Regions:
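Juxtamembrane intracellular "pre-TM" segments in multi-pass secondary transporters
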Residues: 9-16, 194-223
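Helix-breaking motifs and short loop linkers at transmembrane-helix boundaries and internal kinks
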Residues: 51, 83, 104-110, 138, ...
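Conserved MFS/SLC helix-loop-helix module at the cytosolic interface between two early adjacent transmembrane helices
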Residues: 70-106
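Helix-to-loop junctions at the C-terminal end of transmembrane segments
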Residues: 72-83, 271-283, 368
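Paired small-residue
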Residues: 94, 98-101, 109-117, 309-317
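Cytoplasmic helix-loop-helix junction between adjacent transmembrane helices
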Residues: 114-152
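Helix-loop-helix hairpin linking two adjacent transmembrane segments in secondary transporters
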Residues: 148-191
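C-terminal membrane-cytosol helix-exit motif in multi-pass small-molecule transporters
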Residues: 180-199, 390-395
């Protein structure tokens, strides 16, 4: 049952902390991030302990993320065909089993295989949290709750790396054991998560035809292209070349890199909680345009920061941009899709997000080799300019 809240004021919206469906849906983001954010800080330690190069050890991250690129659309189809909860619970159990197995893997090759299997289950998480929220809420409540998606991602980015680093002080295998909590979460979701399944699911041929029609009618291709370009530009700039800038230009430590990333995550988290208020003043298209312009300004400022503390302003601007952009794209897609199609629509968008992050290092590598981090940031800003061009081709929406 969808809640209709178009006429509610901000103060009349239900308390999100008392909404079990919302909390359980957002909890999926934590499990997605556990497999990345808790592992990245321990890669140098793993390299030393196992006597392997950092590049080879990084395969534990690639093995986890790659399945999502190819399998997320299929997971969305299954969620539309058989039901959200029917796909979620088995995926959670498989995730927990393979994740716990990673902590006990007797060899590096076995660890990679288990991470690959774990990544298969994560492909379903990437679509289900946004699909379920799109199913359950509408109007201002949907706007607010889509904003909480970015808030949760930001909180995970700020907290989980610290947790992984602290556990690694005891033993490098311990961060891999965190998915064991998925068993508890699966039990809670089984008992308390209410998800209305689509009333009608057509046969496969009709289903794919409807999806194709929906894409062109509701500017889906533009939104997918925006997701791909924005994720490539922002991930490459802030997750890959910002740390290089801090390390090379300012002799920054890993702790300083983490601190400046946390600043961006905190700003993103705060702004994403205010999306309802922002959407009462500006349309969704205007919010997207503003976020990409903020990205361009931020990326243009990065090479000229001068000092480590000079990075604070551009990184805060990147947080503002991130807090508005991703959730706004999800709102566009959710409103443009029916319940029977929403899983697949969100799945394709999630695949574009993962693909953008995967190709980011290669897109910015040549500019970096030619002119250092400055050229990498300029190239990333150019990518965001492309997002502005695409966003201008979206229909003007009403404020809510």
């Amino acid at each position: 049952m969808t809640r209709y809240s178009c006429g509610m004021s901000d103060s009349a919206l239900p308390n999100p902390l008392k909404d079990k469906n919302l909390l359980l849906s957002l909890g999926l983001i934590i499990f997605i991030q556990l497999g990345i954010s808790s592992i990245i800080p321990i890669l140098p330690l793993m390299s030393d302990e196992l006597g392997l190069s950092l590049g080879k050890v990084s395969l534990v991250v690639a093995a986890y993320t790659m399945p999502s690129i190819f399998l997320t659309p299929f997971a969305g189809y299954l969620a539309d065909r058989f039901g959200r909860k029917e796909i979620l619970i088995p995926s959670l159990l498989f995730y927990s089993i393979t994740g716990t197995g990673c902590a006990l893997a007797p060899s590096f090759s076995m660890l990679i295989w288990l991470r690959l299997l774990q990544g298969i289950s994560v492909a379903t998480f990437g679509v289900l949290f946004s699909t379920i929220i799109g199913d359950l809420y509408s109007g201002k409540e949907r706007v607010r709750n889509m904003g909480y998606i970015t808030t949760t991602f930001s909180a995970c980015t700020a907290v989980i790396p610290l947790a992984g680093g602290l556990l690694a002080l005891i033993h490098w295998r311990l961060p891999f054991a965190l998915p064991i909590f998925g068993f508890v979460y699966a039990n809670l979701a089984f008992k308390h998560l209410y998800v209305p399944n689509p009333n009608h699911t057509p046969d496969t041929r009709s289903y794919l035809a409807n999806i194709k029609k929906s894409l062109f009618l509701h500017h889906g291709l533009i939104l997918y292209s925006i997701t791909l370009l924005a994720s490539a530009g922002s991930f490459g700039a802030y997750q890959i070349y910002m740390p290089k800038l801090v390390n090379v230009a300012f002799s920054g430590s890993p702790a300083q890199i983490g601190s400046i990333l946390t600043l961006s995550a905190l700003v993103s988290g705060v702004i994403s909680t205010q999306l309802v208020a922002i959407n009462t003043l500006f349309s969704k298209r205007s919010m997207l345009l503003a976020s990409f312009i903020l990205y361009i300004i931020s990326m243009g400022m990065m090479p000229f920061a001068g000092t480590y503390w000079g990075l604070a302003i551009p990184m805060a601007l990147s947080g503002l941009a991130q807090g508005m952009s991703y959730s706004t794209i999800l709102m566009f897609l959710s409103e443009a899709s029916s319940a029977a199609q929403r899983g697949s629509i969100m799945a394709i968008n999630a695949s574009m997000l993962t693909l953008g992050q995967s190709i980011a290092p290669y897109i910015l590598l040549l500019p970096y080799m030619a002119g250092g981090t400055a050229w990498a940031f300029i190239t990333a800003a150019s990518i965001m300019a492309g997002c502005v061009w695409l966003a201008l081709r979206l229909p003007q929406t009403h404020r809510q």
